[in-house]
Amino acid sequence: MIAISDTAIPRIPRGVRLSQDRVRNRWVLLAPERILELDEIAQAVLVLCDGVHDVAGISTELAKTYQAETAEIMTDVKEMLGGLAAKHFVVL
């Protein structure tokens, strides 16, 4: 797992796309020879991985949306992004 700071600015790298699979009615991350099906929360996080929002900003936005504590959300966001970064689905 990759350690992530609050000020890291995640983005989806070249060659990876966030896309809606209309056949399965699911959001997916598409990469060369790989596909990752996303749940609603993962999709909400990845939409904000635009190269502008930092991890703290993403966590704050999601805390507002889901009416949860920012610190709790940030822990989950960091864990998810760390796993995705280790698999090269996001860059920091």
What are these model-derived regions, one by one?
Residues 34-92:
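Long, charge-rich, low-complexity alpha-helical segments
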Residues 1-47:
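Acidic, low-complexity/disordered tracts enriched in E/D and polar residues
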